[in-house]
């Protein structure tokens, strides 16, 4: 999108569309809970979504009309991510149904470890590819084509995975009361409220990060790839560490500590300029350490709150609130940047971006403190339930 010279707001919006597209997940239970077997439907969603997103790179070969290309890219990315968000709900429930509750956390840790290793290698290699082609269209063509091949391979492998039969409601119907059940669960409702405000506060600035690094701080793709590799390597290194901490201190401890470490990345970004670009090497360390524990713990935590039945509705509400927050976030970030003052001194070069990161840090810290550092009596509710 930066290559196509899109507007800052469109870049921020589409850059985050993979997250906010999950809003439609709220309707997923009406389909998934009527299906005993979901694999063929999920694979169809998988392939269609990836084909739409990966194929945007071929648009300049079809037309030279810049307005048409931008419109087509926007439609294909949004539609592809909407389908992917719908797929994500079903695939996550499928994945979690393959393991017992006792083995769940260990399975999530091992799976995440391998995912992070693959992400690290891929992001590093693709950054090198872009720089080898001098950030030209050919470089993007190679990357997106490679991604398309990997996506098709992934679908073929997925077709070989065993699928347990899903227990559907008597008569094959699924009611509105079943879809609304997560909102009646007080603990899960509290978790949903946290999810909304936590991701809203972070995404209102993070949705503009790639734009800020490339267009304003003027970093090359190799350096950005190094930053991503540092984050992913740190996550890989800390995955097993957080797993040991969880066994000793509990899931709640991991959540409340790792959440704080995550948002420290945004504090560092608030001081990032062309002059201070080297501090960017510290930001992924906090991101890697924090997300190394938080992303796994938040998945385990929400599945601990869910009953064994009707998980699609619970996962759907999580996806919907997460998606809604990330849809609103770029607009909120854009609004704040129009209001924030232009300052130019030794600390601030692009003050509107930098102050936005600082606001993200402050608001997200407040959300974390309210959720995880409330009076001891409230915290013990979850701890006691774990022991039970």
Language model segments and positions:
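Helix-to-coil boundary motifs at intracellular loop junctions of multi-pass secondary transporters
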Residues: 3-4, 34-35, 94-98, 212, ...
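C-terminal transmembrane helical hairpin of 12-TM major facilitator-type secondary transporters
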Residues: 253-295
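Juxtamembrane intracellular "pre-TM" segments in multi-pass secondary transporters
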Residues: 163-193, 216, 381-388
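Substrate-agnostic recognition of the 12-TM MFS/MFS-like secondary transporter fold
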Residues: 14-29, 42-49, 72, 76-137, ...
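Juxtamembrane helix-start motifs in multi-pass secondary transporters
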Residues: 40-44, 143, 250-257, 356
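Short amphipathic helix-loop junctions that connect adjacent transmembrane helices
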Residues: 1-10, 207-224, 341
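Multi-pass alpha-helical transporter architecture, strongest
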Residues: 24, 56-61, 150-162, 353-388
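C-terminal ends and interior cores of transmembrane alpha-helices
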Residues: 46-67, 131, 260-275
């Amino acid at each position: 999108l930066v290559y196509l010279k899109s507007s800052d707001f469109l870049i921020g919006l589409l850059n985050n569309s993979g997250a906010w597209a999950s809003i439609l997940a709220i309707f997923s239970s009406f389909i998934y809970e009527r299906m005993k077997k979901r694999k063929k439907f999920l694979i169809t969603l998988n392939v269609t979504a990836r084909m739409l997103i990966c194929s945007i790179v071929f648009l300049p070969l079809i037309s030279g009309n810049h307005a048409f290309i931008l419109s087509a890219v926007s439609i294909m990315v949004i539609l592809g991510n909407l389908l992917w968000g719908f797929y994500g709900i079903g695939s996550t429930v499928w994945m979690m149904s393959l393991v017992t509750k006792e083995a769940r956390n260990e399975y999530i840790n091992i799976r995440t470890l391998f995912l992070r290793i693959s992400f690290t290698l891929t992001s590093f290699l693709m950054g090198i590819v872009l720089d080898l082609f001098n950030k030209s269209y050919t470089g993007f063509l190679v990357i997106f084509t490679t991604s398309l091949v990997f996506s098709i391979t992934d679908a073929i492998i997925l077709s070989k995975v065993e699928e347990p039969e899903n227990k559907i409601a008597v008569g094959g119907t699924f009611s509105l009361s079943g879809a609304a059940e997560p909102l009646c669960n007080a603990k899960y409702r509290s978790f949903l409220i946290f999810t909304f405000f936590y991701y809203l506060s972070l995404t209102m600035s993070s949705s503009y990060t790639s734009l800020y690094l490339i267009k304003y701080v003027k970093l090359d793709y190799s350096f950005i790839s190094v930053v991503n590799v540092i984050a992913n390597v740190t996550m890989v290194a800390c995955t097993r560490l957080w797993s040991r901490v969880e066994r000793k201190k509990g899931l709640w401890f991991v959540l409340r500590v790792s959440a704080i470490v995550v948002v420290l990345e945004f504090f560092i970004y608030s001081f990032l300029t062309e002059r201070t670009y080297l501090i960017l090497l510290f930001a992924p360390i906090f991101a890697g350490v924090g997300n190394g524990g938080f992303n796994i713990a938040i998945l385990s935590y929400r599945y601990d709150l869910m009953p064994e039945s009707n998980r699609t509705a619970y996962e759907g509400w999580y996806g919907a609130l997460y998606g809604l927050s990330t849809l609103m976030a770029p607009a909120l970030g854009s609004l704040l940047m129009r209001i924030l003052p232009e300052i130019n001194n030794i600390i601030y070069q692009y003050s509107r971006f930098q102050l936005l990161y600082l606001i993200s840090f402050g608001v997200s810290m407040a959300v974390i403190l309210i959720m995880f550092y409330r009076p001891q009596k409230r915290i013990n509710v979850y701890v006691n339930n774990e022991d039970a």
